[in-house]
């Protein structure tokens, strides 16, 4: 394996822990088998020696991704190159086995192999290394042995089985692969040399009891084996040559899933090395072969314009320029292959519509004659939308091409359908194309099957169903005469409804309907009633399949349909007042136009319908009279008894077709609205993420925006800063943690206060950051602010712009957004970067880095950025679309700021930005880093990126990708380096360098001769260097750019007005910080961060549980579950009794919120009985027609009556995770939630128990029994909560965090492991068998989930092709994993522990 390839592969990562638990016996910690289906594995753990020995005999394991170099075999040996060679090797292996080995195999395979009597000779290579290799193997064997084996020779001859074990287990523990190809080859040779050779062993074993004469006779008869050494040597030399020529590839070492995860598949490499922007390749992968014609390109521009224009709200006279701008942007994307940042930065003039008008201010002689006004046609979001619509249009054209091909094939069979020919060019949506496709399959199904049969596509020639047969019999029989008698075709009826052309009125048949039906009787339909029934069915199907009729329905529904929700029986009890879906439970009569302005509401409706909680109804309002309108279009103009009967017949056939059309159109409309609403919420998420990214580093007063500050950060985590240690970290500008430590109580301990003062004065930070994940952090914030003021701790000096004097201000204490730090503190990245720091200190480090550059911290999260909260309903969005939208926001911001390419080579945090640079992506970013490293590890100029043969520089990127990324990768200007170009440190694209140089020359007032002389002597960048050296950049402001821009457009057809302005700005301030100032959190944001509550989840009128802390004569201080304090006045407790008679310290009671001060984390509460009797009702302002108040009241009464009948007193626990569910309901509720989500619910075991249900994986839920102890009242939560008689917690939050969430992290760690298979146990065993069949000389193992026993996984392993698959239960526990009674903290320890355990067992068996 080459070094370059090895660098692409990281070692086994230490992933976050995530585990699950099970229910235990309360006294002994043993599993309760009576409830095993729900909470335990039911797997008996038998430690019997014979059982273990049997399992060991069935096979041992070596990772399938480890090289099989032992035994002289390489991957080349595994392949069946020559049958003779394989037989030769097989005989060698058999010859190495002694009697004990054969007995062992015989027990496993059911028979004993025949002994081998023939031996082969092999040439030894590098024999001098035998001794060393033997020592290595002996060391591994002796790990498990107390005795020292002194006789190496004896071990070689008489203990061959131990060699066999060493071969198999040599690389059993996961190790890195050699970096050096020579080292890899050396190891292969070592393995061959170290293997005990059968010829030596065989000779000694077979001739030990023979005397010399006998040996001479045997040699005379059979020879000594040397006669044919030359042939064997030639054969082995040929094998060696083939082995050397066949290089090891990544796919020989890693599984496809691993290569895919690491972006190292052949497809990834193709993307990596293709000279096209990576994001374009991925987006257009499906339509790689689709080439748009010039006419289709124009059509696409019109199609996208029509999609975007209605939402822009621009003046009507800008519609034509808007369409041209869209067309030009498409040209940039498709023809020039440049990405959004490039277009926005370097083609900005094409996104504007400029007007040149005569200056109205003619009185001012110095005023210009003309003024320029500009209208912004497209913004950056529009460019991303155009790119998205381009993919949709390609999908549309691809489907239309397939449809046209089908029509052409039918025309080849002399089938012409004018309606299809007319409607295909008119179609503008995928739905309309699908309607046409459905119509073709309905109308010409048999012909299409014949075409498919001719083409050999047997999948389309399956036997038609009974419905198709019926319709075909009607179509080909006499009954179709009745269909014609309806007077007009289904398509013509649709035309009438759509008002297309002149209305055609149906003619009534000369006979009455029944008489006509009787006349059409045949062998298929033997009665008139059958004829009428079949004809109705046929015509209704024709109406249902009519593309025009569907279009009429669809248009009408979009225009006038109203949407209502109806709760199901399941949703009646599930959706209670606190349920997130309550706001849609009784929603009714909502116009589509209104719902699209509340996208969250409709997404909740669709999700609730998927969960079976509600049904969504789309109805045409009665005032619209939609069905009656259709009746009228189908009526004849005749008046008679016969005409009336035909009118009734037509009405019946419409009534038959209407529900079918209504159902399919309603489904289609709902999906279209869902997609629209998803796009709207995705847009909101993107905007919110962009807002967080659009923050420059924190700027202390007097510093230039963009300067990185030195930060001191403190945090108390979840603890009380008055009682528990406060962690702090000091982080320099470059992100290094220089110093860290702990402090005590800063409010009262003077010694600690002085220590803090000394720290600040010694380190002189630019700012103090603070954060935490509890409401107690507010105390720390107040303590720090008080300390700064009391001790006079000042920030850095800065120049006062008013007085020009230097002064200082008190050091600012900033509460920092900690959403990134919370993910970082326990991540594998944090553990790798700061293994010696505790989680809270690592949290402080992340907070400091966030203040130094928020964008880099978000980029470092990678895929985890999707787990942050941007919108309350983001869980209702497709995960892949959300990730793509978030990535687009990062792309915008990274390219706005640019990336110092040389800094990226030395700093991983900066390198994390490279995938978001225009033209690049995760694959190309790694390629860029490796190529630059190959070129010496640094970039001198932007031109070097496309290669420089003269200086031996290899190309880093291709020309097209370079064109995309060049201006966004900057190189700091070095005045002392003559080859350094100042423009390489700007946002100016190399294609515009000549413009920049000309502007510099004009600013310096140099003529052409001066410019030529300067450039001839010092190179093309000399003029700009001179401008910088003379510090004359401000002179570019004196240039009149308008005339120059007009000249460029007139002479070269280049629109560069905005580009010239960019060049002017960059010459004055290269890559100036354009992000907004660091955003300080608002009071409500701080409240949410510290408490987890929002103004919607904790507000006035809510009834919450509170814990009484202090009781005075006229008030009480209480604490809410979220951690904030509350005050209850005496008159808000009771009018009749003293407050001390009602309340006592430590008591838990219910209280109603009267007012909340979100800034001070204080609430005013009432405990009066009359106030508590009025429940909180979420405000719903939908009007009487928009909410079904009658059904709501009836449902509440029904539930009350049911509770009275059952006599059930529902227990209520005031906790955000508590739900009044049973186990099944909890599983249904958690079904749509992410893994690890928790529901606390009443227990069927009584009021001294609670049940906790959490989602282990999709369809797998664990139910945990929690015993409550030290309960104050029957319904109060116990002060001690015990799980399984083994784990004890003091409150529900601790139980969730330390028990359930800890297990969830372990489960996630296991499921993200390379060895995890997202399959059932049976499928995993099949996979192992298939893998071993393909790799017969390997052993392997895998993990899979045990769906029958939540919280358990199977460790399945297979030692060889003939061995059975053995499965061992692995249990997730809060501290790690448990296997066979042993606990392991993480997956690496679990895997290695498993291997060591079975290696040990096998070694012991070998010794016996």
UniProtKB/Swiss-Prot annotation:
Q: GO CC terms on record?
A: transcription elongation factor complex
The gene is SPT6
Q: Name one Pfam family in it.
A: SH2_2
Function in brief: Histone H3-H4 chaperone that plays a role in maintenance of chromatin structure during RNA polymerase II transcription elongation thereby repressing transcription initiation from cryptic promoters. Mediates the reassembly of nucleosomes onto the promoters of at least a selected set of genes during repression; the nucleosome reassembly is essential for transcriptional repression. Essential for viability.
Q: Does the keyword Hydrolase apply?
A: no
Record InterPro entries:
HHH_9 (IPR041692), NA-bd_OB-fold (IPR012340), RNaseH-like_sf (IPR012337), RuvA_2-like (IPR010994), S1_domain (IPR003029), SH2 (IPR000980), SH2_dom_sf (IPR036860), Spt6-like_S1 (IPR049540)
Query: What positions does the domain SH2 occupy?
Result: 1213-1314
Write out the ranges of the annotated region (Disordered).
Answer: 1-199
PANTHER family xref list = TRANSCRIPTION ELONGATION FACTOR SPT6
The UniProt transmembrane annotation reads none
Lineage, uppermost ranks: Eukaryota, Fungi, Dikarya, Ascomycota, Pezizomycotina
The record ties this protein, via SUPFAM superfamilies, to:
Nucleic acid-binding proteins, Ribonuclease H-like, RuvA domain 2-like, SH2 domain, Tex N-terminal region-like
What name appears for this protein in its UniProt entry?
Transcription elongation factor SPT6
What keywords sit in the KW lines?
A: Chromosome, Nucleus, SH2 domain, Transcription
PROSITE patterns in the record, alphabetically? S1 (PS50126)
UniProt similarity note: Belongs to the SPT6 family.
List the signal peptide residues.
none
């Amino acid at each position: 394996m080459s070094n370059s390839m090895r660098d692409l592969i990281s070692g086994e990562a230490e992933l976050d822990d995530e585990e699950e638990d099970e229910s235990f016996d309360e006294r002994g910690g043993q599993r309760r088998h009576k409830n095993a289906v729900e909470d335990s594995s039911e797997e008996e753990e038998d430690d019997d020696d014979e059982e273990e020995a049997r399992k060991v005999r069935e096979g041992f394991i070596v990772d399938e991704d480890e090289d099989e170099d032992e035994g002289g075999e390489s991957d080349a040996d595994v392949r069946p190159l020559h049958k003779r060679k394989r037989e030769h090797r097989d005989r060698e292996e058999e010859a190495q086995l002694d009697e004990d080995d054969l007995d062992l195999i015989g027990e496993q395979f059911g028979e004993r192999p025949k002994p081998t009597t023939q031996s082969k000779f092999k040439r030894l290579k590098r024999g001098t290394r035998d001794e060393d290799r033997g020592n290595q193997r002996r060391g591994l064997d002796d790990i498990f042995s107390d005795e020292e084996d002194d006789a190496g020779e004896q071990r070689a001859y008489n203990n061959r089985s131990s060699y066999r074990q060493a071969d198999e287990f040599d690389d059993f523990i996961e190790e890195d692969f050699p970096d050096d190809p020579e080292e890899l080859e050396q190891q292969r040779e070592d393995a061959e040399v170290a293997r005990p050779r059968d010829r030596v062993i065989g000779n000694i074993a077979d001739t030990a009891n023979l005397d010399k004469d006998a040996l001479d006779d045997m040699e005379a008869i059979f020879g000594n084996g040397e006669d044919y050494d030359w042939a064997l040597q030639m054969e082995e030399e040929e094998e060696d040559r083939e082995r050397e020529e066949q290089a090891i590839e990544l796919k020989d070492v890693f599984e496809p899933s691993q290569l895919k995860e690491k972006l190292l598949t052949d497809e990834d490499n193709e993307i990596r090395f293709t000279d096209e922007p990576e994001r374009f390749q991925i987006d257009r992968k499906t339509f790689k072969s689709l080439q748009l014609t010039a006419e289709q390109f124009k059509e696409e521009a019109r199609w996208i314009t029509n999609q975007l224009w209605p939402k822009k709200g621009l003046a009507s006279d800008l519609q034509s320029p808007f369409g041209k701008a869209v067309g030009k942007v498409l040209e940039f994307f498709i023809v020039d292959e440049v990405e959004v940042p490039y277009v926005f930065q370097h083609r900005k003039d094409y996104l504007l519509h400029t007007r040149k008008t005569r200056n109205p201010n003619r009185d001012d002689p110095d005023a210009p004659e003309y003024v320029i006004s500009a209208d912004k046609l497209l913004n950056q979001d529009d460019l991303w939308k155009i790119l998205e619509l381009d993919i949709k249009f390609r999908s549309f054209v691809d489907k239309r091409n397939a449809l046209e091909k089908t029509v052409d094939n039918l025309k080849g069979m002399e089938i012409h359908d004018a309606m299809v020919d007319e409607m295909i060019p008119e179609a503008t949506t995928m739905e309309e194309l699908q309607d046409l496709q459905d119509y073709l399959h309905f109308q010409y199904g048999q012909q299409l099957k014949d075409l498919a049969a001719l083409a050999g596509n047997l999948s389309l020639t399956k036997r038609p169903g009974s419905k198709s047969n019926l319709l075909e019999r009607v179509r080909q029989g006499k009954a179709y005469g009745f269909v014609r008698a309806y007077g007009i075709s289904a398509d013509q009826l649709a035309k009438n409804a759509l008002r297309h052309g002149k209305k055609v009125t149906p003619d009534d048949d000369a006979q009455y309907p029944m008489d006509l039906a009787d006349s059409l009787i045949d062998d298929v339909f033997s009665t008139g009633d059958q004829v009428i029934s079949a004809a109705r069915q046929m015509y209704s199907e024709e109406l249902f399949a009519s593309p025009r009729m569907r279009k009429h329905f669809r248009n009408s529904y979009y225009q006038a349909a109203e949407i209502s929700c109806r709760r199901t029986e399941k949703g009646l009890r599930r959706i209670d007042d606190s349920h997130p879906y309550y706001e849609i439970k009784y929603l009714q009569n909502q116009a589509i136009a209104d719902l699209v302005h509340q996208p969250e509401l409709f997404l909740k409706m669709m999700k609730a319908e998927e969960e079976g909680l509600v049904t969504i109804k789309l109805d045409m309002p009665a005032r619209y009279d939609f069905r009656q309108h259709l009746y009228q279009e189908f009526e004849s103009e005749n008046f008679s008894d016969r005409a009336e009967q035909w009118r009734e017949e037509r009405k019946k056939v419409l009534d038959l077709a209407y529900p079918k059309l209504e159902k399919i159109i309603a489904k289609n409309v709902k999906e279209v609205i869902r997609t629209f609403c998803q796009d709207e919420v995705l847009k909101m998420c993107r905007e919110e993420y962009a807002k967080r990214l659009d923050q420059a580093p924190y700027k202390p007063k007097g510093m230039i925006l963009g300067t990185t500050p030195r930060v001191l950060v403190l945090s108390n985590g979840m603890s009380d800063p008055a009682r528990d240690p406060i962690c702090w970290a000091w982080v320099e500008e470059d992100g290094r943690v220089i110093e860290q430590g702990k402090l005590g109580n800063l409010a009262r301990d003077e010694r600690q206060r002085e220590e803090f003062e000394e720290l600040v004065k010694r380190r002189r930070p630019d700012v103090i950051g603070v954060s935490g994940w509890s409401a107690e952090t507010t105390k720390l914030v107040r303590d720090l602010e008080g300390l700064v003021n009391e001790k006079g701790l000042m920030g850095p000096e800065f120049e006062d712009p008013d007085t020009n004097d230097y002064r200082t201000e008190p050091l600012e204490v900033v509460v920092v957004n900690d959403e990134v730090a919370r993910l970082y503190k326990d991540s594998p990245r944090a553990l790798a970067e700061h293994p010696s720091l505790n989680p809270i200190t690592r949290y402080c480090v992340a907070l400091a880095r966030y203040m130094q550059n928020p964008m880099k911290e978000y980029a470092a999260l990678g895929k985890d950025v999707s787990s942050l909260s941007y919108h309350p309903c983001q869980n209702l969005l497709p995960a892949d679309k959300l990730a793509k939208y978030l990535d687009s926001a990062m792309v915008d911001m990274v390219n706005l700021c640019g990336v110092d390419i040389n800094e990226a080579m030395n700093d991983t945090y900066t390198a994390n930005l490279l995938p978001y640079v225009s033209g690049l992506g995760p694959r190309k970013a790694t390629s860029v880093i490796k190529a630059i490293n190959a070129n010496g590890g640094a970039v001198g100029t932007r031109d070097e990126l496309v290669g420089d043969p003269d200086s031996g520089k290899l190309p880093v990127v291709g020309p097209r990708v370079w064109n995309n990324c060049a201006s966004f990768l900057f190189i700091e200007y070095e005045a002392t380096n003559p080859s350094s170009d100042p423009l390489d440190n700007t946002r100016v694209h190399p294609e515009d360098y000549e413009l920049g140089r000309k502007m510099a020359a004009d600013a310096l007032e140099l003529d052409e001769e001066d410019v030529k002389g300067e450039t001839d002597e010092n190179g093309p960048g000399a003029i700009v260097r001179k401008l910088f050296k003379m510090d004359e950049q401000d002179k570019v402001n004196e240039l009149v750019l308008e005339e120059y821009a007009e000249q460029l457009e007139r002479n070269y057809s280049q629109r560069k007005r905005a580009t010239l302005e960019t060049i002017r700005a960059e010459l004055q301030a290269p890559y100036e910080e354009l992000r907004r100032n660091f955003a300080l959190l608002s009071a409500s944001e701080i409240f949410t961060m510290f408490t987890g509550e929002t103004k919607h989840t904790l507000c006035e009128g809510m009834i919450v549980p509170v814990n009484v802390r202090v009781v005075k004569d006229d008030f009480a201080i209480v604490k809410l579950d979220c951690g904030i304090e509350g005050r209850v006045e005496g008159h808000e407790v009771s009018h009749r009794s003293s407050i001390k008679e009602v309340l006592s310290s430590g008591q838990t009671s219910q209280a109603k919120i009267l007012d909340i001060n979100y800034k001070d984390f204080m609430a005013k509460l009432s405990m009066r009985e009359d106030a508590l009797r009025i429940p909180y009702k979420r405000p719903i302002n939908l009007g009487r027609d928009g909410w079904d108040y009658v059904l709501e009241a009836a449902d509440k009464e029904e539930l009350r009556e049911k509770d009275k009948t059952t006599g059930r007193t529902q227990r209520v626990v005031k906790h955000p995770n508590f739900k009044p569910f049973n186990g099944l309901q909890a599983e249904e509720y958690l079904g749509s939630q992410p893994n690890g989500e928790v529901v606390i619910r009443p227990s069927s075991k009584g009021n001294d128990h609670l049940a906790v249900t959490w989602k282990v994986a999709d369809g797998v839920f664990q139910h945990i029994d929690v015993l409550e102890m030290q309960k104050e009242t029957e319904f109060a939560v116990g002060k001690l909560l015990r799980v399984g008689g083994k784990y004890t917690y003091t409150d529900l939050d601790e139980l969730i965090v330390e028990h359930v969430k800890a297990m969830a992290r372990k489960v996630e760690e296991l499921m993200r492991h390379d060895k995890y298979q997202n399959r059932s146990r049976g499928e995993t065993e099949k996979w192992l068998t298939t893998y071993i069949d393909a790799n017969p000389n390997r052993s392997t193992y895998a993990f899979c989930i045990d769906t029958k026993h939540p919280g358990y996984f199977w460790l399945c392993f297979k030692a060889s092709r003939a061995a059975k698959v053995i499965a061992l239960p692995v249990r997730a526990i809060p501290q790690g994993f448990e296997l066979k009674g042993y606990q392991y903290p993480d997956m690496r320890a679990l895997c290695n522990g498993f291997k060591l355990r079975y290696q040990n067992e096998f070694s012991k068996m070998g010794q016996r």
